Amino acid sequence: MTKNPRNNKPKKILDSSYKSKTIWQNYIDALFETFPQLEISEVWAKWDGGNVTKDGGDAKLTANIRTGEHFLKAREAHIVDPNSDIYNTILYPKTGADLPCFGMDLMKFSDKKVIIVFDFQHPREKYLFSVDGLPEDDGKYRFFEMGNHFSKNIFVRYCKPDEVDQYLDTFKLYLTKYKEMIDNNKPVGEDTTVYSDFDTYMTELDPVRGYMKNKFGEGRSEAFVNDFLFSYK
């Protein structure tokens, strides 16, 4: 009996339990409805906290590499524990068109600490990228240095878990603008050195090491940062 080839397509969710467990599902759906070509090509890791620490024992991580037309890769990670729900993705476009990445950090650390960040992250150092018609940041979030791989349009909001979808329409607008960049330029280059400075900077900036070490141990934490999150440095 011939199998239906449609059944062999990679899922657009991380695993069978993912859809019912994340508060970020509407954002994830919007992302892959905008870029349906980004299919899972590698399941990089599926971890649980095991016995690393008492605090980390209930933590679970899934990390995927996605590939698709006009993109070198999109790498996504989803981390959950009884309090946290964190979804992180960066889309790396193919090179030759001087385009930014698109990055999103959707972070629920507790019911009192939820942070939404998405932005056009340009690989060029000391270059202030901006898009007309989108909100502009006022610079109050000093952690994100506009003009150094973060754009003038970086979107940062703190909210409560039941408020996250209030910013979904803005997120979709950013996605629409980014899709226009990709569709208009259709990048095809594969020079990963273009992203060397970007990944080096993000490695130094990213605060995930301490969190990951606590949840999954030092070895896994270092591998996650260096071999998965920022592998082009």
From Swiss-Prot:
EC number: 1.3.7.6
Reactions mediated catalytically: (3Z)-phycoerythrobilin + 2 oxidized 2[4Fe-4S]-[ferredoxin] = biliverdin IXalpha + 2 reduced 2[4Fe-4S]-[ferredoxin] + 4 H(+)
GO biological process terms on file: phytochromobilin biosynthetic process
Domain of life: Viruses
Keywords on record: Oxidoreductase
GO MF annotation list: cobalt ion binding; oxidoreductase activity, acting on the CH-CH group of donors, iron-sulfur protein as acceptor
Gene3D superfamilies assigned: 3.40.1500.20
Family: Belongs to the HY2 family.
Role summary: Plays a role in phycoerythrobilin biosynthesis, the red pigment chromophore photosynthetically active biliproteins of the host cyanobacteria. Uses a four-electron reduction to carry out the reactions catalyzed by two enzymes (EC 1.3.7.2 and EC 1.3.7.3) in host.
Protein name as catalogued: Phycoerythrobilin synthase
